[in-house]
Regions:
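Structural alpha/beta surface segment adjacent to cysteine/selenocysteine redox centers
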Residues: 1-74
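C-terminal cap of thioredoxin/glutaredoxin-like
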Residues: 1-9, 70-147
Length: 147
């Protein structure tokens, strides 16, 4: 969720934003290779390239074929051949699987899911701004001894 990531950076004193892959392959059969492509972009292009790729993938959830993923990687200035090679060899499959296992272990069963001071917040919200305010308040409770 790009809106949550950008909001979290504005209150970094209260919280830390950590992204974990949790591709939902039932509704999105191409979600696993998309996550692997994003990890390839991150490994070769850094955090900014990863987030640019993430945002493109989020916007284009219905266009995640290998050729699409390679084109998106090129659009964020990643080397398309490197990403293609990583996808062909499944270079980042284990990384994505570790994230999924970690999520399952923590009770994650869908996206988006957030943890603030050990409490899970999941599902979709009709008012993202109110949800972000709720997360921020929960984060503050943890930093000021209130929770």
């Amino acid at each position: 969720m790009p809106c949550c990531r950008s909001s979290c950076t504005s209150w970094a004193d209260d919280a830390r934003f950590v992204f974990r892959n949790f591709p939902l392959t039932d509704p999105h059969p191409r979600a696993q290779p998309a996550a692997e492509a994003a990890e390839s972009v991150a490994a070769h292009g850094g955090e900014d390239a990863f987030w640019a790729m993430h945002d493109i993938l989020f916007t284009n959830q219905d266009a995640l074929e290998i050729d699409d993923l390679i084109a998106y990687a090129e659009a964020v200035a990643a080397d398309p051949q490197t990403v293609a090679d990583d996808l062909a060899t499944r270079a980042f499959a284990d990384r994505v699987r570790r994230d999924v296992r970690s999520g399952l272990h923590s009770g994650v069963d869908g996206t988006p899911t957030f943890f603030v001071n050990g409490r899970r917040y999941d599902g979709l919200w009709s008012d993202p701004a109110a949800f972000i305010d709720e997360l921020r308040a929960a984060a503050r409770q943890g930093t000021d001894g209130g929770g």
